[in-house]
From Swiss-Prot:
Protein's name according to its UniProt entry: Bifunctional polymyxin resistance protein ArnA
Renumbered residue ranges of the record's region Formyltransferase ArnAFT: 1-304
NAD in keyword set: yes
The species this protein was found in: Klebsiella pneumoniae (strain 342)
Gene3D superfamilies: 3.40.50.12230, NAD(P)-binding Rossmann-like Domain
Active-site positions on this chain: H104, E434, R619
Amino acid sequence: MKAVVFAYHDMGCTGIQSLLDAGYDIAAIFTHPDNPGENHFFGSVARLAAEQGIPVWAPEDVNHPLWIERIREMKPDVLFSFYYRNLLGDEILNLAPKGAFNLHGSLLPKYRGRAPLNWVLVNGESETGVTLHRMVNRADAGDIVAQQTVAIGPDDAALTLHRKLCAAATELLGQALPAILEGKTAERPQDHSQATYVGRRTPEDGRLDWEQPAQTLHNLVRAVSDPWPGAFGYAGANKFIVWKSRVRHDLPAAKPGTVISVAPLIVACQDGALEIVTGQTERGVYMQGAQLAQALGLVSGAVISSKPVVAIKRRTRVLILGVNGFIGNHLTERLLQDDNYEIYGLDIGSDAISRFLESPRFHFVEGDISIHSEWIEYHIKKCDVVLPLVAIATPIEYTRNPLRVFELDFEENLKIIRDCVKYNKRIIFPSTSEVYGMCTDKNFDEDTSNLVVGPINKQRWIYSVSKQLLDRVIWAYGDKYDLKFTLFRPFNWMGPRLDNLNAARIGSSRAITQLILNLVEGSPIKLIEGGKQKRCFTDISDGIEALFRIIENKDGRCDGQIINIGNPENEASIKELAEMLLACFERHPLRDRFPPFAGFREVESSDYYGKGYQDVEHRKPSIRNAKRCLNWEPKVEMEETVEHTLDFFLRTVELVDDKNP
């Protein structure tokens, strides 16, 4: 049986050797290049493949059409994945008639996801194991072919458990692979209701929080001990690593973080104390706890912490161009809630940000980005993070004023990008969901989806291609000149202060604002092409929280990333949005102040937008990058967003009426 294998790490070597022992014909092996930032204590899949005379590749994107075609030409009967770090797309999974199988380091359905070996130790589990399962388009969710349980001893650390799992995998594969070869597997579906999920771990996750129970910290030490990066704490500004520990409950309670003893080195925790058996200073050598205490200058009664004691950090300076806009004013509000940020803003108006003008951390100048280029360059040089939020982003303007869209959205923003390169400043650039155009994917993926636009005579695409070209320019500057950047793509953000009713009166607004104007004025709601187009509507509070986390950029996770920010659960057609809005309007306490509902009216897009318009049937984001980089998921349901948005505009109208009797 011909197999194509995707493998890495010791488990990859174990899987390949087991396949060879079982008599499989391995046509090719796909692996990863070694990361220079990792401790390479494990076996090399590439070396094993070369020694066995098997072709081996390490592509950056194995799901690229070129690699899919090469694998198709190999005509594999079966696929195997052994600790390969990237998900395989459906096109690859469907290439093997006998199916695709993955070896996972836990007892599925528990601990789906990344680093299960470390997580079971962190959580103090008494057993784990390995699972061979069929691969489906959902990670770690396919039917189970075989499982092998591994007991976790009280003295097991990451490396000893890793070795146990490798041994268990050898035993499991020795039985399961011949069964697959003979077509005699007994598979069972997973109980998805029992599934648990764990995410990728980083060195920062090894931080010791002395406010936690001693057993919790001991489990963390076991989970990340050598050859993993280790659990760590700080004595003043000096970092130290703990390699081995034990829990002590035989000592008087003390304030968490207090050094109870230096020989042996014992530190008080919330419940019990942690004895540091072995460890090292950040640039030192492996040593016993008592010697570590000497190296750190610790004495009994001293207090150590989970963070370094350092001088007060300067606030991060954030430059927001277009600060009075929908995203800009909400982002300003969120940044001012955190004392770590100072905001510099430019816009042609200040009505939406007037509530911030008295803040000592908010510095505003009224101006136009096409005129105040010297001010902008000076503040790019002065600030740490730049967000150019100025753009014409309403569909009717794409056909009505295409050249103005190009001049502002592309040409003016290109100047800002080049200044960020010149002064080595981080740019967070607002791309758009429009760049995906007429992509046919079910979910638009930042890294794999094609960007599909219409013909030249459909000028509505000038906004999309202007943004797309800027995305590509920024990416190129990042690649060639190390520009620090993150591209974020909002998917139909809604909420208070989205456009205004005056803009809606001339057709230059987003959909919900136009619909609200129709209700307020008692004019028919116009449904373009019947309102069948589907969008995923995202509450502004969800969107801003994601954007705030991009600015935070913990551990640099957002550097060089493209991140969709949208709510795939809030998918609805424009007609459904209008019906939901109407229902909210009819039950609103201010309903009696407005005219009767004038009904729906279907219109052709060319009549409403002009002949240069072309619509998009659906626009649904994949948010895997947002989950991975930001630990973010949207929370607000669509109806709540619609209610808040409607309420804001109706009360705005009320205020205007009160001032103009």
